[in-house]
Amino acid sequence: MLALVLIKNRNLKILRVNEKKLLKKQYKIKIAYTGICASDIPRAYSSGAYNYPLIMGHEFCGTIVKCGKEAKKYKKNDFVSAYPLIPKCKKCESCKSENFQLCKKYSYYGSREDGSMSEYLNVNEWNIFKLKKSIPPRLGCLMEPIAVAFNIFKNITNRDSKILILGCGFIGLILSGILNSKNFINVDVLDKNVHKLSKLPNKKFVKLKYNLNFFDIKKKYNYIIDLIGNEKSLSTSLKKTIEGGKILLAANVYKDMNISRENINLILRKGLTIKGIWNSTLKRKGNNWNQAQEFILKNKNWILSLISHTVSLENSKNIFKNIFLRKIFNKNKNFEYIKCIIKNN
């Protein structure tokens, strides 16, 4: 089968690779679309992979073309996506409470094992999420990041709260859409790219340009959601959260941080709550994936407008380099990228 293979750091190749044997409780998925996650860029270009060679891709959808001998829950031709995290124990306290994303013994499609940037992928029955036929395939591959946005949202409880989103990438935009759909109105969003801010779902949401010094922000907020994940964004969050406020950290961090004693003391003096959020939940109650599917069905056109680039699997190699080097431009020669999806023929 055809696959985009990360041979080593900064070395991606389109190759013919052997298909893996289908295990008894797996389904062979013919991949329709794969989303490129922001984490895939450092994985490919900043020595972020756990092992090589690797087929990346953890945001995907497709059709079941073959069922393992003991795979009975789904059937051939079902349209599906998949929860990419594979808990290995199912016995720890996190797994018992259905917080599978907190399990320490896990694998992960597209990260710790091969993923969906290929023609086919064998997926465990446990990980399969069946999609409604009314979900457009171009949006089916975005289930995972939208579910992550819902995992962030569940921590924001007061509709009258003042909220600041730091970072207006795809998940930040989706979170703004969720807040808008739930009638939150006191929402400010900060990003350095005007074209991203232009996609906000509500004209009343305040747009903050990134080249404004973070610390020049005049307001203080009940909730700050840090989707940037650097020293400056964390320091800003500590300074700009009100007494008793909450900081939600939901970005992968790729460099060490030095946080001043003054800022650390703000956590104590202001009684701040800092919470880390990673991945999404598959709980029977409050399942982020069910929420994501319903959100897609109600907001198809807006979410489609967030897909800035679509490339074929055969031509997918160069898009990674262009994103990494910020060489995706509009006619005014401004960097213009939100979300890229890879299409299989």
Descriptions of predicted regions:
Residues 20-34, 47-93, 127, 132-134:
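Glycine-rich beta-strand-centered segment in the early N-terminal region that forms part
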Residues 215-224:
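A short acidic, Gly/Pro-enriched loop at the edge of an enzyme's catalytic core
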Residues 232-298, 344-345:
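Glycine-rich phosphate-binding loop and adjacent beta-alpha segment
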Residues 88-166:
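NAD(P)H dinucleotide-binding glycine-rich loop of Rossmann-like/cofactor-binding domains
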Residues 287-345:
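C-terminal hydrophobic helical "lid"/dimerization subdomain
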Residues 81, 224-225:
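N-terminal Rossmann-like NAD(P) cofactor-binding module of classical short-chain dehydrogenase/reductase
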Residues 136-211:
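Mid-domain Rossmann-like dinucleotide-binding core that forms the NAD(H)/NADP(H) cofactor-binding site
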